[in-house]
């Protein structure tokens, strides 16, 4: 359960020896090793909708591993992408433990939604995970999350009986068109649209205030007359192709299942479903190139991590840390890999033969050479690029007004939300 105010405001310094949650707020120190005194520990855990069954099994395993404590753990639905949105207005009303994508870590910290790790929890997290994942949990000189996945990126899935040349977007679209099938791309999703802009060389850079909690300035050239225009034209061309279908996870999985889709861009979380649909024709590889006005570009992508955050407003802070550590531990990362082929951040599992032989993870690794780390993303990026993508899909962005639309997007990205 969550309280509107940290319990420390009421009893810190008065019942210092027993008020565990209160100590979490006194002085801002780490309390991840404190043991709660309550008989029944009540926690709320947020996770993606498609992971609810698996999370229920993980919670059962957690309870079995801690038989001397009585837990009441409630599951809630919140995708990793939506964690900051749900917590930004009132983190005290949020879950005790929640999953999030690493690009949100600064904003989550800014609104006070992340408890700092310390003691054995910190040392275990740092020793078990890869360097990139550990750094994704870091803000300044502290660590504020538990990594559980290093596969937050995307690549190409395809039916190899239909698509035989995956080197270029044109070749993929032509193969789909000839076979009367579709290529699915989430063109009104900023996360995927970045592939075109990064591919043509567009960049951004955020300068933060000294405490890391606010944007001081944002530089961005997504509206560049050459690079930005090339990316925009590529998106316009894709949206106009008869073999293109705009869609996300549900559309591409349904399309592979019924045979109407022959290629799609997504991540490892859909590997099991797509492989089940395609069988022997299942294949995956890095993203293709695209050509605009005679110049060929390699599609880029975001590369990121997924982590568990612990809400400092938890009434059972130490137990919330214990749950987050368990869910991100080696055994549960192994379960995620076996259930959804989610790429582990745990170094032992990542080095296993099963992971090395995985088709989707191999494709993700190949795409990694062209990926941009999903860190320090401007706060205005997501809504601005999504709006541009929506307009491309609606065909209200044309070659004639492209520069104007790009400038509107660029100005929105460069705006500093906290100024």
Residue ranges: model-predicted function:
Residues 144-148, 154, 172-220:
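Extracytoplasmic/periplasmic solute-binding protein
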Residues 8, 19-20, 26-104, 411-419:
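Conserved N-terminal structural module of periplasmic/extracytoplasmic solute-binding proteins
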Residues 88-89, 93-96, 124-158, 181-185, ...:
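A structural signal for short loop-to-beta-strand junctions that line the ligand-binding cleft
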Residues 212-246:
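Glycine-centered hinge/linker elements that transmit conformational signals in sensory
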């Amino acid at each position: 359960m969550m309280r509107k105010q940290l319990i420390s405001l009421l009893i810190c310094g008065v019942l210092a020896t027993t008020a565990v949650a209160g100590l979490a707020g006194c002085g801002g120190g780490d309390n991840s090793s404190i043991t709660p005194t309550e008989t029944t520990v009540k926690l709320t855990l947020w996770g993606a909708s498609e992971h609810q069954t698996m999370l229920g099994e993980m919670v059962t395993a957690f309870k079995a591993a801690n038989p001397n404590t009585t837990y009441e753990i409630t599951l809630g639905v919140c995708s990793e992408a939506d964690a900051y949105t749900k917590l930004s207005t009132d983190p005290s009303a949020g879950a005790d433990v929640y999953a999030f994508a690493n690009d949100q870590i600064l904003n989550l910290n800014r609104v006070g939604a992340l408890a700092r790790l310390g003691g054995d929890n910190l040392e275990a997290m740092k020793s078990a995970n890869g360097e990139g994942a550990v750094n994704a949990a870091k803000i300044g000189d502290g660590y504020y999350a538990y990594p559980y996945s290093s596969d937050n990126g995307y690549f190409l899935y395809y039916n190899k009986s239909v698509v035989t040349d995956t080197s270029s977007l044109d070749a993929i679209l032509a193969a789909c068109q000839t076979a009367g099938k579709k290529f699915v791309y989430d063109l009104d999703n900023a996360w995927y649209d970045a592939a075109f802009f990064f591919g043509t060389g567009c960049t951004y850079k955020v300068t933060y205030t000294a405490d890391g909690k606010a944007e001081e300035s944002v530089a961005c050239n997504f509206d560049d007359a050459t690079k930005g225009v090339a990316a925009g034209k590529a998106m316009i061309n894709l949206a106009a192709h008869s073999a293109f279908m705009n869609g996300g996870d549900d559309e591409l999985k349904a399309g592979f299942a019924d045979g109407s889709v022959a290629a799609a861009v997504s991540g490892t979380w859909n590997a099991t479903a797509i492989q089940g649909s395609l069988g022997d024709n299942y294949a995956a590889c890095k993203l293709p190139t695209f050509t605009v006005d005679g110049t060929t570009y390699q599609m880029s992508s975001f590369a990121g991590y997924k982590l568990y955050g612990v809400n400092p407003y938890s009434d059972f802070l130490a137990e919330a840390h214990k749950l987050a550590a368990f869910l991100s531990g080696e055994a549960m990362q192994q379960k995620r890999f076996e259930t959804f082929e989610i790429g582990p951040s745990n170094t032992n599992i990542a080095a296993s033969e099963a992971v090395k032989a995985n088709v989707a993870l191999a494709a993700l690794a190949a795409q990694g050479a062209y990926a941009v780390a999903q860190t320090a993303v401007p706060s205005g990026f997501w809504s601005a690029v999504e709006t541009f993508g929506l307009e491309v899909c609606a065909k209200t962005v044309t070659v004639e007004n492209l520069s104007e639309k790009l400038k509107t997007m660029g100005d929105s990205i460069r705006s500093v939300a906290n100024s």
